Amino acid sequence: MLRQLNLTREISRWIFMPWQRGAAGTASAEPPALPINDVIVDYDGPDLPLPEYPQRPNEPLEIRKQRLVYQSRKRGMLENDLLLSTFAAKYLKNFNEEQTAIYDQLINGVSNDWDIYYWATDVKTTPAEYNTEIMQLLKEHVKNTERVQRFRQPDLT
């Protein structure tokens, strides 16, 4: 992190403060040489390891449900925030321990939130490992047969 900060500072000086490029006010035409170790490459590759979601085997059921309510509301994309928060508000309180564990695996085991959205809306086929009773319940919830307006997340109770 510190190396990245130093690299950013050096690049900013070279671009935005040309009077500080050289020593004692002399401007050099070349940017400062950067060590190859400071270059950060960020890319999507098939060989990148995905982080594993930590299992919480001894977590009490009520604490787990509270965590899942929070995680359903804070997905990082509005579509899933609305779908999952309304789903959790409607169904999560009545889930038993097994159903809660399945829902936990569904929203935290998938590495890409767009996959959850596409599976729930039947745009893509749901893989067998996630095609559970909870996913079927989520798909029914997404169909919104009651025509409930979902413009905002439900209030916390």
From Swiss-Prot:
One of its GO terms (biological process) is protein-FAD linkage. One of its GO terms (cellular component) is mitochondrial matrix. The keyword Mitochondrion applies. Gene3D superfamilies: Flavinator of succinate dehydrogenase. The keyword ATP-binding does not apply. It comes from the Eukaryota. Keywords: Chaperone, Mitochondrion. Coiled coil: none annotated. Belongs to the SDHAF2 family. Interacts with the flavoprotein subunit within the SDH catalytic dimer. HAMAP family: SDHAF2. This is Succinate dehydrogenase assembly factor 2-A, mitochondrial. It comes from Drosophila willistoni.
